[in-house]
Amino acid sequence: MTTPTAELGPLDGPLADALADLAARQAVGRLWNHDHTLWSPEPTEIVDRLGWLDVLDDMAAERGRIDDFVARLKRDGFTHCVVMGMGGSSLFPEVIARTFPTGRSGLDLQVVDSTDPAAVARALAAVPEDTTLFLASSKSGGTIETRSHLDFFWDQIGRPEQFAVVTDPGSDLGRLARERGFREVFENRADIGGRYSALSFFGMVPAALNGTDWFGLVERAREVVPSLRSADPAVNPGLWLGALLAAAVGARRDKLTLVLDPRVEAFGLWVEQLVAESTGKAGTGVVPVVDEPIGPADVYGPDRLV
Protein backbone atom coordinates (compact mmCIF):
# COMPACT_ATOMS: atom_id res chain seq x y z
CA MET A 1 0.00 0.00 0.00
CA THR A 2 1.08 3.59 -0.61
CA THR A 3 0.31 6.84 1.14
CA PRO A 4 -2.93 8.39 -0.19
CA THR A 5 -2.65 11.41 -2.45
CA ALA A 6 -3.80 14.59 -0.73
CA GLU A 7 -3.47 18.34 -0.99
CA LEU A 8 -2.94 19.36 2.61
CA GLY A 9 -1.57 22.90 2.39
CA PRO A 10 -1.31 24.26 5.94
CA LEU A 11 -1.82 20.78 7.40
CA ASP A 12 1.52 19.44 6.10
CA GLY A 13 3.38 20.55 9.21
CA PRO A 14 0.76 19.43 11.76
CA LEU A 15 0.51 16.05 10.00
CA ALA A 16 4.27 15.52 10.27
CA ASP A 17 4.10 16.43 13.96
CA ALA A 18 1.20 14.04 14.57
CA LEU A 19 3.02 11.18 12.84
CA ALA A 20 6.16 11.87 14.86
CA ASP A 21 4.13 11.82 18.07
CA LEU A 22 2.50 8.50 17.19
CA ALA A 23 5.90 7.03 16.33
CA ALA A 24 7.39 8.20 19.63
CA ARG A 25 4.48 6.64 21.51
CA GLN A 26 4.81 3.38 19.53
CA ALA A 27 1.09 3.71 18.89
CA VAL A 28 0.69 1.04 16.23
CA GLY A 29 2.34 -1.74 18.23
CA ARG A 30 0.52 -0.78 21.40
CA LEU A 31 -2.82 -0.76 19.58
CA TRP A 32 -2.32 -4.28 18.26
CA ASN A 33 -1.18 -5.39 21.72
CA HIS A 34 -4.47 -4.12 23.18
CA ASP A 35 -2.57 -1.66 25.40
CA HIS A 36 -5.26 0.52 27.00
CA THR A 37 -2.66 3.04 28.22
CA LEU A 38 -2.46 4.29 24.65
CA TRP A 39 -5.67 6.12 25.51
CA SER A 40 -6.06 6.14 29.27
CA PRO A 41 -4.54 4.68 32.45
CA GLU A 42 -8.02 3.38 33.24
CA PRO A 43 -8.80 0.16 31.32
CA THR A 44 -12.58 0.37 31.74
CA GLU A 45 -14.44 0.22 28.41
CA ILE A 46 -11.16 -0.08 26.50
CA VAL A 47 -9.66 -3.53 27.06
CA ASP A 48 -13.06 -5.14 26.50
CA ARG A 49 -13.64 -3.28 23.22
CA LEU A 50 -10.60 -4.22 21.10
CA GLY A 51 -11.69 -7.63 19.84
CA TRP A 52 -12.27 -6.23 16.36
CA LEU A 53 -8.51 -6.35 15.87
CA ASP A 54 -8.58 -10.15 16.00
CA VAL A 55 -12.01 -11.01 14.62
CA LEU A 56 -10.99 -11.88 11.05
CA ASP A 57 -9.50 -15.27 11.92
CA ASP A 58 -12.58 -16.01 14.03
CA MET A 59 -14.87 -15.32 11.09
CA ALA A 60 -12.75 -17.37 8.70
CA ALA A 61 -13.24 -20.31 11.06
CA GLU A 62 -17.03 -19.78 10.91
CA ARG A 63 -17.25 -19.93 7.12
CA GLY A 64 -18.81 -23.38 6.98
CA ARG A 65 -21.41 -22.60 9.64
CA ILE A 66 -22.54 -19.34 8.04
CA ASP A 67 -22.66 -20.71 4.50
CA ASP A 68 -24.56 -23.80 5.66
CA PHE A 69 -27.07 -21.61 7.52
CA VAL A 70 -27.86 -19.67 4.35
CA ALA A 71 -27.91 -22.78 2.16
CA ARG A 72 -30.44 -24.48 4.45
CA LEU A 73 -32.66 -21.40 4.33
CA LYS A 74 -32.62 -21.41 0.54
CA ARG A 75 -33.28 -25.14 0.47
CA ASP A 76 -36.27 -24.63 2.77
CA GLY A 77 -37.75 -22.04 0.43
CA PHE A 78 -36.91 -18.79 2.22
CA THR A 79 -36.89 -15.73 -0.03
CA HIS A 80 -36.62 -12.68 2.27
CA CYS A 81 -34.92 -11.56 5.47
CA VAL A 82 -35.80 -8.75 7.88
CA VAL A 83 -32.91 -7.61 10.09
CA MET A 84 -33.94 -5.93 13.34
CA GLY A 85 -31.29 -3.77 14.98
CA MET A 86 -30.20 -0.33 16.08
CA GLY A 87 -26.96 1.60 15.62
CA GLY A 88 -23.96 -0.60 15.00
CA SER A 89 -26.15 -3.69 14.76
CA SER A 90 -28.08 -2.31 11.80
CA LEU A 91 -25.86 0.19 9.97
CA PHE A 92 -23.53 -2.25 8.25
CA PRO A 93 -26.40 -4.55 7.21
CA GLU A 94 -28.01 -1.39 5.78
CA VAL A 95 -24.81 -0.66 3.85
CA ILE A 96 -24.83 -4.21 2.48
CA ALA A 97 -28.49 -4.04 1.45
CA ARG A 98 -28.04 -0.68 -0.30
CA THR A 99 -24.69 -1.42 -1.94
CA PHE A 100 -24.91 -5.02 -3.15
CA PRO A 101 -27.81 -6.49 -5.13
CA THR A 102 -29.31 -9.67 -3.74
CA GLY A 103 -27.11 -12.54 -4.86
CA ARG A 104 -28.44 -15.71 -6.47
CA SER A 105 -27.65 -17.61 -3.27
CA GLY A 106 -29.19 -14.97 -1.00
CA LEU A 107 -32.42 -13.55 0.33
CA ASP A 108 -34.02 -10.16 -0.29
CA LEU A 109 -32.67 -8.19 2.68
CA GLN A 110 -34.28 -5.27 4.45
CA VAL A 111 -33.38 -3.56 7.72
CA VAL A 112 -35.84 -2.38 10.36
CA ASP A 113 -34.36 0.25 12.68
CA SER A 114 -37.35 2.57 13.03
CA THR A 115 -39.55 2.89 16.09
CA ASP A 116 -42.41 4.27 14.01
CA PRO A 117 -45.23 1.68 14.25
CA ALA A 118 -46.36 2.46 10.71
CA ALA A 119 -42.85 1.85 9.36
CA VAL A 120 -42.60 -1.49 11.17
CA ALA A 121 -46.03 -2.52 9.87
CA ARG A 122 -44.97 -1.58 6.32
CA ALA A 123 -41.88 -3.75 6.69
CA LEU A 124 -44.05 -6.75 7.53
CA ALA A 125 -46.47 -6.01 4.71
CA ALA A 126 -43.58 -5.88 2.23
CA VAL A 127 -42.46 -9.48 2.78
CA PRO A 128 -44.13 -12.88 2.37
CA GLU A 129 -44.88 -14.05 5.90
CA ASP A 130 -44.24 -17.74 5.25
CA THR A 131 -40.82 -17.44 3.56
CA THR A 132 -39.16 -14.63 5.52
CA LEU A 133 -36.43 -14.99 8.14
CA PHE A 134 -36.52 -12.48 11.00
CA LEU A 135 -33.04 -11.80 12.40
CA ALA A 136 -32.83 -9.91 15.70
CA SER A 137 -29.43 -8.31 16.21
CA SER A 138 -28.42 -6.84 19.58
CA LYS A 139 -25.06 -6.94 21.34
CA SER A 140 -26.51 -6.51 24.82
CA GLY A 141 -29.63 -8.49 24.02
CA GLY A 142 -31.67 -5.88 25.83
CA THR A 143 -31.91 -3.09 23.26
CA ILE A 144 -35.50 -1.97 23.83
CA GLU A 145 -36.18 -1.07 20.19
CA THR A 146 -34.91 -4.40 18.88
CA ARG A 147 -36.75 -6.38 21.54
CA SER A 148 -39.93 -4.47 20.66
CA HIS A 149 -39.46 -5.30 16.97
CA LEU A 150 -38.91 -8.95 17.87
CA ASP A 151 -42.03 -9.03 20.05
CA PHE A 152 -44.09 -7.56 17.21
CA PHE A 153 -42.87 -9.97 14.53
CA TRP A 154 -43.11 -12.94 16.91
CA ASP A 155 -46.71 -12.06 17.72
CA GLN A 156 -47.48 -11.88 13.99
CA ILE A 157 -45.55 -14.98 12.83
CA GLY A 158 -44.86 -17.15 15.87
CA ARG A 159 -42.89 -19.86 14.07
CA PRO A 160 -39.44 -20.38 15.63
CA GLU A 161 -37.91 -21.76 12.44
CA GLN A 162 -38.36 -18.27 10.94
CA PHE A 163 -36.33 -16.52 13.64
CA ALA A 164 -32.62 -16.21 14.44
CA VAL A 165 -30.50 -13.87 16.55
CA VAL A 166 -27.03 -12.35 16.70
CA THR A 167 -26.00 -11.34 20.20
CA ASP A 168 -23.27 -11.57 22.84
CA PRO A 169 -22.77 -14.70 24.97
CA GLY A 170 -25.07 -14.95 27.96
CA SER A 171 -27.54 -12.28 26.86
CA ASP A 172 -31.25 -12.43 27.60
CA LEU A 173 -31.90 -12.40 23.86
CA GLY A 174 -29.83 -15.54 23.39
CA ARG A 175 -31.63 -17.27 26.24
CA LEU A 176 -35.01 -16.30 24.81
CA ALA A 177 -34.03 -17.61 21.38
CA ARG A 178 -33.04 -20.98 22.82
CA GLU A 179 -36.17 -21.22 24.95
CA ARG A 180 -38.33 -20.61 21.89
CA GLY A 181 -36.28 -22.90 19.67
CA PHE A 182 -35.16 -20.28 17.16
CA ARG A 183 -33.47 -21.54 14.03
CA GLU A 184 -30.01 -20.22 14.94
CA VAL A 185 -28.19 -18.26 17.65
CA PHE A 186 -24.95 -16.58 16.57
CA GLU A 187 -22.97 -15.49 19.63
CA ASN A 188 -20.43 -12.80 18.84
CA ARG A 189 -17.25 -12.32 20.85
CA ALA A 190 -18.13 -9.92 23.63
CA ASP A 191 -15.09 -7.64 23.30
CA ILE A 192 -16.31 -5.89 20.15
CA GLY A 193 -18.25 -2.65 20.37
CA GLY A 194 -21.30 -2.25 18.17
CA ARG A 195 -19.86 0.26 15.71
CA TYR A 196 -16.75 -1.91 15.24
CA SER A 197 -18.72 -5.09 14.57
CA ALA A 198 -19.01 -4.90 10.76
CA LEU A 199 -16.66 -7.84 10.15
CA SER A 200 -18.12 -9.97 12.93
CA PHE A 201 -21.35 -11.98 13.00
CA PHE A 202 -23.28 -8.70 13.23
CA GLY A 203 -22.20 -7.69 9.73
CA MET A 204 -21.22 -10.91 8.04
CA VAL A 205 -24.35 -12.95 8.77
CA PRO A 206 -26.59 -10.32 7.09
CA ALA A 207 -24.07 -10.06 4.24
CA ALA A 208 -24.23 -13.82 3.72
CA LEU A 209 -28.02 -13.72 3.87
CA ASN A 210 -27.98 -11.08 1.13
CA GLY A 211 -25.93 -13.38 -1.07
CA THR A 212 -22.93 -11.07 -0.88
CA ASP A 213 -19.46 -12.61 -1.03
CA TRP A 214 -18.99 -12.08 2.71
CA PHE A 215 -15.97 -14.34 2.92
CA GLY A 216 -14.32 -12.36 0.14
CA LEU A 217 -14.73 -9.25 2.31
CA VAL A 218 -13.06 -11.05 5.21
CA GLU A 219 -10.22 -12.31 3.02
CA ARG A 220 -9.53 -8.88 1.54
CA ALA A 221 -9.50 -7.41 5.04
CA ARG A 222 -7.00 -10.07 6.12
CA GLU A 223 -4.75 -9.13 3.20
CA VAL A 224 -4.57 -5.56 4.52
CA VAL A 225 -3.64 -6.52 8.10
CA PRO A 226 0.16 -6.67 7.52
CA SER A 227 0.07 -3.09 6.22
CA LEU A 228 -2.01 -1.96 9.18
CA ARG A 229 0.53 -3.47 11.57
CA SER A 230 3.35 -1.39 10.07
CA ALA A 231 4.66 1.68 11.89
CA ASP A 232 5.54 3.25 8.53
CA PRO A 233 2.84 5.75 7.43
CA ALA A 234 3.90 5.20 3.82
CA VAL A 235 2.75 1.59 4.23
CA ASN A 236 -0.04 1.95 6.80
CA PRO A 237 -2.98 4.01 5.46
CA GLY A 238 -4.80 3.75 8.79
CA LEU A 239 -1.90 5.36 10.63
CA TRP A 240 -1.64 8.14 8.05
CA LEU A 241 -5.38 8.86 8.05
CA GLY A 242 -5.65 8.82 11.83
CA ALA A 243 -2.74 11.24 12.11
CA LEU A 244 -4.33 13.49 9.48
CA LEU A 245 -7.62 13.66 11.38
CA ALA A 246 -5.76 14.49 14.60
CA ALA A 247 -3.73 17.17 12.84
CA ALA A 248 -6.88 18.66 11.34
CA VAL A 249 -8.66 18.82 14.69
CA GLY A 250 -5.60 20.47 16.20
CA ALA A 251 -5.85 23.09 13.46
CA ARG A 252 -9.59 23.53 14.18
CA ARG A 253 -10.68 21.60 11.10
CA ASP A 254 -13.08 19.35 12.95
CA LYS A 255 -15.73 18.83 10.23
CA LEU A 256 -15.01 15.79 8.05
CA THR A 257 -16.88 15.95 4.73
CA LEU A 258 -17.18 12.56 3.03
CA VAL A 259 -17.35 12.59 -0.77
CA LEU A 260 -18.18 9.10 -2.01
CA ASP A 261 -18.74 7.42 -5.35
CA PRO A 262 -22.52 6.97 -5.78
CA ARG A 263 -22.01 3.21 -6.00
CA VAL A 264 -20.78 3.11 -2.39
CA GLU A 265 -22.46 6.18 -0.93
CA ALA A 266 -24.25 4.07 1.70
CA PHE A 267 -20.82 3.30 3.17
CA GLY A 268 -20.83 6.88 4.46
CA LEU A 269 -23.60 5.98 6.91
CA TRP A 270 -21.32 3.52 8.68
CA VAL A 271 -18.28 5.82 8.60
CA GLU A 272 -20.44 8.63 9.99
CA GLN A 273 -21.32 6.63 13.09
CA LEU A 274 -17.82 5.20 13.46
CA VAL A 275 -16.22 8.66 13.50
CA ALA A 276 -18.92 10.52 15.42
CA GLU A 277 -19.35 7.94 18.16
CA SER A 278 -15.65 7.11 18.52
CA THR A 279 -14.53 10.70 19.04
CA GLY A 280 -15.79 13.49 21.25
CA LYS A 281 -15.68 11.38 24.40
CA ALA A 282 -13.19 13.70 26.10
CA GLY A 283 -14.38 17.02 24.75
CA THR A 284 -12.55 16.82 21.42
CA GLY A 285 -14.08 15.20 18.38
CA VAL A 286 -14.71 15.11 14.65
CA VAL A 287 -18.11 15.91 13.13
CA PRO A 288 -18.70 13.82 9.98
CA VAL A 289 -20.78 15.33 7.17
CA VAL A 290 -22.41 12.93 4.70
CA ASP A 291 -24.82 13.26 1.78
CA GLU A 292 -23.91 16.92 1.28
CA PRO A 293 -24.06 18.24 -2.32
CA ILE A 294 -20.55 18.72 -3.70
CA GLY A 295 -19.60 22.34 -4.30
CA PRO A 296 -16.52 24.27 -5.43
CA ALA A 297 -13.65 24.48 -2.96
CA ASP A 298 -14.48 28.02 -1.90
CA VAL A 299 -17.85 27.01 -0.41
CA TYR A 300 -16.16 25.00 2.33
CA GLY A 301 -15.20 26.87 5.46
CA PRO A 302 -11.82 26.76 7.20
CA ASP A 303 -13.18 24.15 9.62
CA ARG A 304 -13.60 21.51 6.87
CA LEU A 305 -11.50 18.53 5.83
CA VAL A 306 -12.88 17.09 2.59
Language-model features: where?
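Gly/Ser/Thr-rich loops at beta-strand to alpha-helix junctions
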Residues: 82, 86-93, 139-146, 169-172, ...
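Active-site phosphate/pyrophosphate-binding segments
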Residues: 159-306
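Glycine-rich oxoanion-binding loops at beta->alpha junctions
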Residues: 51-68, 93-137, 142-144, 290-297
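Extended, charge-enriched "interface" segments that sit outside catalytic cores
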Residues: 1-75
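Short helix-loop-beta junction
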Residues: 96-107, 155-156, 274-285
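Alpha-helix capping and helix-loop boundary segments enriched in small/acidic/polar residues
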Residues: 111-118, 122-123, 137-144, 148, ...
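Glycine-rich phosphate/diphosphate-binding loops that line cofactor/substrate pockets in enzymes
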Residues: 65-79, 122-132, 244-253, 300
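Short glycine-rich or small-residue beta-strand-to-loop segments that form or flank ligand, phosphate
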Residues: 54-56, 80-85, 133-140, 164, ...
